[in-house]
Amino acid sequence: MVFRRYVEVGRVAYISFGPHAGKLVAIVDVIDQNRALVDGPCTRVRRQAMPFKCMQLTDFILKFPHSARQKYVRKAWEKADINTKWAATRWAKKIDARERKAKMTDFDRFKVMKAKKMRNRIIKTEVKKLQRAAILKASPKKAAVAKAAIAAAAAAAAAKAKVPAKKATGPGKKAAGQKAPAQKAAGQKAAPPAKGQKGQKTPAQKAPAPKAAGKKA
């Protein structure tokens, strides 16, 4: 694009840094190649000399004579409705967004993150719907294949949903059946031990008894 933002009388400029940073002014006169006489009657900037390196030229131009007084500048400013036009530009919106982002807290950033995730999820689902609709419209063969795939996916999802319920009932029955042997085992432990078990447990005690009987004989 051709550059059209020239330094001229009536050009509205944005002050990028300095004591009046963030405000708009109108160039009333050009002093030299480095400075200009500016005035901002509607932005509370007094008429003063300002270097060009502090200003960024905008697309707005006011119509008033060379070195006009403040009342003429104010009248032209209000007639052109510069403040509302400036607020509607991308430039002003980006500056406002940057300032709001700098003032955000951790909780605000967390809410923005969750909102972005939700937005991306909604966009993804809508894109998938549009893709499926496009496939169905493209060719009948692909439409049939797509319908079969959708049906298979639905059946698989239904099967997965039913399998855990069956598994849950199966182990429950087995567990109920296993409770009876556990009770029997407890009953066996409570009963007194048999004599044969005593002899098996203490073979060393009965071994010296026969030796003693042989000596007595």
Curated annotation (Swiss-Prot):
Sequence repeats: 173-177, 178-182, 183-187, 188-192, 195-197, 198-200
Region (Disordered): 162-217
One cellular-component annotation, GO: synapse
Ranges where the record places region 4 X 5 AA tandem repeats of Q-K-A-[APS]-X: 173-192
Annotated spans, 2 X 3 AA tandem repeats of K-G-Q: 195-200
Keywords: Acetylation, Cytoplasm, Isopeptide bond, Phosphoprotein, Repeat, Ribonucleoprotein, Ribosomal protein, Ubl conjugation
Domain of life: Eukaryota
InterPro entries noted in UniProt: Rib_uL2_dom2 (IPR014722), Ribosomal_eL14 (IPR039660), Ribosomal_eL14_dom (IPR002784), Translation_prot_SH3-like_sf (IPR008991)
N6-succinyllysine: modified positions: K85, K206
Crosslink (Glycyl lysine isopeptide (Lys-Gly) (interchain with G-Cter in SUMO2)) position: K124
Entry-annotated residues carrying N6-acetyllysine: K79, K85
Signal peptide: none
Biological process according to GO: cytoplasmic translation; translation at postsynapse; translation at presynapse
Segments crossing the lipid bilayer: none
Function: Component of the large ribosomal subunit. The ribosome is a large ribonucleoprotein complex responsible for the synthesis of proteins in the cell.
Subunit structure: Component of the large ribosomal subunit.
Name of the protein in question: Large ribosomal subunit protein eL14
Source organism per UniProt: Mus musculus (Mouse)
Gene label: Rpl14
